């Protein structure tokens, strides 16, 4: 499912990468050539004994070869002097939502990305995970 929103400063395109998954999954390749920004949201619902680690892989050759991306910008609270917090993965261990971004200074040259959701259960699995991306042109 994709949604397009037009704002005065550009077009925002929303894509569901993983929809209510219950086991480890890799999304299809998402084109990001020419984007100005990419935001990603991971939402866990009904989680009790499940943890999800979300990593991003990126391609610079049209989606043929993918590498782990270690410059996700975390939504953590920092002072101006500390700058942005960059991480290699985001963990969602409880019901809730976490947002983060691909570092905009690294988007030039990137053509595609994939979201890899690794789900670990400790006990009887419960709950689902949904991952959504928003691209700004």
Question: What label would you give each PLM region?
Answer:
Residues 2-137:
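Surface-exposed, low-hydrophobicity beta-strand/loop segments enriched in small/polar/acidic residues
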């Amino acid at each position: 499912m994709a949604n397009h929103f037009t704002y005065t400063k550009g077009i925002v395109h929303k894509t569901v990468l993983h929809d209510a998954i219950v086991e480890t999954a890799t999304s299809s390749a998402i084109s990001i050539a020419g984007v100005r920004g990419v935001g990603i949201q991971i939402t866990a619902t009904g989680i009790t004994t499940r943890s999800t680690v979300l990593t991003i892989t990126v391609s610079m050759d049209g989606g043929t070869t993918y590498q782990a991306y270690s410059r996700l910008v975390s939504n953590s609270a920092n002072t101006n002097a500390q700058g942005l917090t960059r991480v290699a993965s985001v963990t969602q261990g409880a019901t809730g939502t976490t947002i983060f971004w691909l570092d905009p200074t690294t988007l030039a040259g990137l053509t595609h990305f994939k979201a890899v959701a690794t789900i670990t259960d400790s006990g009887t699995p419960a709950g689902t995970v949904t991952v959504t991306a928003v691209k700004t042109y």
